[in-house]
């Protein structure tokens, strides 16, 4: 599995794209504002579509482009967007939780159409990506730790930093 780390200019959040070998789909995690084009580049380079979107918590810098990215499923289908339950209310108006106005490059907020509560048990969010959520409230009410098991090749700006060939 390859893990692409995509730094965002929106409060320095990181978006992630997890691409399991041979699956044809990817899991996009925390698609922040200002990185849509970079997420799309990774998807095109890998030859995959979006299988699901995971939001680790409900802060705006982690959720902003989830609605758009969720429409990049196979043949333009809309895929589920998962978020820990306690943060669901934040999706109605995430900008209201910012201490200041969002940066100029941040577009208008659009709530995802297929927003789902992240299950507490281990689930396969997209083919080949099994994730288990462990609640860890503090940063937000819905903050969580997400556990998975897979050999990883970690990439930043398409450069490999760590490869585990297990």
Segments and roles (model prediction):
Residues 1-46, 145-166:
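Conserved beta-strand hairpin/beta-sheet module of binuclear metal-dependent hydrolase folds
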Residues 2, 14, 25, 79, ...:
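A generic secondary-structure signal marking the coil-to-beta-strand transition
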Residues 10, 109, 138-139:
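Short Pro/Gly-enriched coil loops immediately N-terminal to beta-strands
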Residues 17, 122-154:
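Core dinuclear metal-dependent hydrolase active-site scaffold
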Residues 27, 54, 134-135:
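Residue in the alpha/beta-hydrolase core beta-strand immediately N-terminal to the catalytic nucleophile
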Residues 33-130, 161-162:
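Active-site HxH/HxHxD metal-binding segment of metal-dependent hydrolases
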């Amino acid at each position: 599995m390859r893990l692409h780390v995509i730094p965002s200019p929106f409060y320095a959040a990181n978006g992630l794209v997890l691409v399991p070998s041979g699956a044809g789909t990817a899991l996009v995690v925390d698609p922040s504002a200002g990185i849509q084009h970079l997420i799309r580049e990774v998807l095109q380079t890998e030859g995959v579509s979006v299988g699901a979107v995971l939001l680790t918590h409900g802060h705006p810098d982690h959720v902003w482009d989830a609605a758009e990215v969720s429409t990049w499923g196979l043949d333009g289908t809309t895929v589920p967007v998962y978020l820990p339950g306690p943060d669901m209310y934040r999706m109605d108006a995430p900008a209201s939780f910012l201490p200041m106005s969002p940066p100029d490059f941040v577009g208008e907020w659009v709530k995802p159409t297929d927003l789902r509560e992240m299950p507490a048990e281990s689930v396969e969010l997209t083919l080949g990506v099994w994730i288990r959520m462990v609640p860890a409230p503090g940063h937000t009410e819905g903050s969580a730790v997400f556990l998975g098991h897979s050999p990883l090749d970690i990439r930043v700006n398409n450069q490999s930093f760590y490869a585990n060939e297990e």
